[in-house]
């Protein structure tokens, strides 16, 4: 048994000692069968939430009404959820109620896809009542039971299906894909925040180039912020090297580029992304527009962007041109290292010095003067030494006065 399961085994053993059934379930079991890195380990049990909280000394009630308790075991947190069935769903988003049951199979039956409806006992024996292992072997994503019913219960499952295409490289089962096409309008009931979580995982998947065209083919794009009418662009995005991107702002910048978004800020805000992501993606796009080729960076542009942003710009450019970014990254690193200063804080002078030298009250002119100074230093027009900058600034001011 793999270490992540061994570390949680004590929880299952204690539940069993108290007379309850308990199994590993969900994505961790799926990823074990796929040979992928195992993430969070979840446990399903016949014990009621209050039983779980009575058995374990350290628990956190994160949703006992819906059956889930976090058990802290050997310093790690594990979600332990009571076997349950879902009642009727409201607004295509969540069940109105849940019913706790004693059957593992009944619990697995409510899950979204067969590959996620697999359990494993304490000895490593796989319990697979819905053909999840066969779906994994065939590399297909298929719903548990009737696809239309699953998607009408929670419309976000349609986005999850396409997200799993991106993460795993699987294909949608024909009946599953057809049900998404038929029920795509239900996505309008889902909050932007939930859609954004799935979209970010989709963009970060190693097979994003397969998943993005699927948004167009299934019609889901019509109900996603800013993607309506972008079928052609989403299909063309299949040619981009999405796995080359490591940062979320790079992925959103490339999506804007792929879609031909003219104003990135309204588009990104519609996804309710953090301001930092909106600003950084916008800055990357602005640099791409201002700097048409990797070799076109000026010293001023490189200094203003900073090394990390400059590397991101060239990573995004590489993703849509197909030229590996490594050589240009190395050149930019060398160029940045050769700059006499790397930040404005490294200037040998400050605003107080400039005011004292010029003898004028503080005002907007001080920033203009400091900007002129750092540009001159970065371009090698003056050394970053106080006396030399003083002489350069005085000469600049005399020249400007003559020309007035």
From Swiss-Prot:
Gene3D superfamilies the record matches: 1.10.110.30, 1.10.246.80, 1.20.58.560, Beta Polymerase, domain 2
KW Ribosomal protein (keyword) present: no
Family stated for the protein in its record: Belongs to the tRNA nucleotidyltransferase/poly(A) polymerase family. Bacterial CCA-adding enzyme type 3 subfamily.
Function, as annotated: Catalyzes the addition and repair of the essential 3'-terminal CCA sequence in tRNAs without using a nucleic acid template. Adds these three nucleotides in the order of C, C, and A to the tRNA nucleotide-73, using CTP and ATP as substrates and producing inorganic pyrophosphate. tRNA 3'-terminal CCA addition is required both for tRNA processing and repair. Also involved in tRNA surveillance by mediating tandem CCA addition to generate a CCACCA at the 3' terminus of unstable tRNAs. While stable tRNAs receive only 3'-terminal CCA, unstable tRNAs are marked with CCACCA and rapidly degraded.
Residues annotated for Mg(2+) binding in this entry: 40, 42
The reaction(s) this protein catalyses: a tRNA precursor + 2 CTP + ATP = a tRNA with a 3' CCA end + 3 diphosphate; a tRNA with a 3' CCA end + 2 CTP + ATP = a tRNA with a 3' CCACCA end + 3 diphosphate
Database matches in CDD domains: NT_ClassII-CCAase (cd05398)
Domain of life: Bacteria
Cofactor: Mg(2+)
Miscellaneous comment as given in the Swiss-Prot or TrEMBL entry: A single active site specifically recognizes both ATP and CTP and is responsible for their addition.
GO molecular function annotation: ATP binding; CCA tRNA nucleotidyltransferase activity; magnesium ion binding; tRNA binding
NCBIfam families xref list: PRK13299.1
Name of the molecule in the record: CCA-adding enzyme
Site (Involved in nucleotide selection): 153
Residues at the site labelled May assist in discriminating ATP from CTP: 112
InterPro entries from the UniProt entry: Bact_CCA-adding_enz_type3_sf, CCA-adding_enz_C, CCA-adding_enz_firmicutes, NT_sf, PolA_pol_head_dom, PolyA_RNA-bd
Major enzyme class: transferase
Record EC number: 2.7.7.72
Keywords, sorted A to Z: ATP-binding, Magnesium, Metal-binding, Nucleotide-binding, Nucleotidyltransferase, RNA repair, RNA-binding, Transferase, tRNA processing
């Amino acid at each position: 048994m793999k270490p992540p399961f061994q570390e949680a085994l004590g929880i299952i053993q204690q539940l069993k000692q108290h007379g309850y059934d308990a199994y590993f379930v969900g994505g961790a079991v799926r990823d074990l069968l796929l040979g992928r890195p195992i993430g969070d380990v979840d446990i399903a049990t016949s014990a009621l939430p209050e039983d779980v909280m009575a058995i374990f000394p350290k628990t956190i009630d994160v949703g006992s009404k819906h059956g889930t308790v976090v058990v802290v075991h050997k310093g790690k947190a594990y979600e332990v959820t009571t076997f349950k069935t879902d009642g009727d769903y409201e607004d295509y988003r969540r069940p109105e109620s849940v019913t706790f049951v004693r059957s593992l199979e009944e619990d697995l039956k409510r899950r979204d896809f067969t590959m996620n409806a697999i359990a494993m006992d304490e000895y490593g024996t796989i319990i697979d009542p819905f053909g999840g292992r066969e779906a994994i072997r065939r590399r297909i994503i298929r719903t548990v039971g009737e696809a239309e019913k699953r998607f009408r219960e929670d419309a976000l499952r349609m986005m999850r299906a396409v997200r799993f295409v991106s993460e795993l490289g699987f294909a949608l089962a024909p009946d599953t894909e057809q049900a998404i096409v038929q029920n795509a309008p239900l996505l309008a009931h889902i909050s932007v925040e939930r859609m954004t979580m799935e979209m970010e995982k989709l963009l970060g998947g190693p097979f994003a180039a397969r998943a993005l065209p699927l948004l167009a083919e299934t019609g889901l794009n019509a109900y996603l912020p800013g993607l309506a009418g972008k079928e052609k662009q989403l299909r063309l995005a299949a040619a981009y090297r999405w796995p080359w991107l490591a940062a979320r702002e790079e992925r959103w910048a490339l999506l804007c580029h792929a879609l031909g978004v003219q104003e990135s800020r309204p588009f990104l805000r519609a996804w309710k992304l953090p301001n930092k992501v909106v600003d950084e993606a916008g800055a990357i796009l602005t640099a791409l527009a201002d700097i048409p080729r990797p070799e076109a960076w000026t010293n001023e542009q490189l200094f203003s962007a900073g090394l990390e942003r400059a590397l991101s710009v060239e990573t995004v450019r590489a993703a849509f041109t197909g030229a590996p970014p490594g050589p240009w990254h190395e050149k930019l690193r060398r160029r940045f290292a050769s700059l006499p200063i790397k930040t404005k804080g490294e200037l040998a002078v400050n605003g107080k010095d400039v005011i004292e030298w010029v003898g004028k009250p503080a005002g907007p002119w001080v920033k203009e003067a400091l900007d002129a100074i750092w540009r001159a230093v970065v371009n090698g027009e003056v050394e970053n030494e106080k006396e030399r900058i003083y002489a350069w600034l005085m000469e600049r001011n005399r020249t400007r006065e003559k020309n007035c």
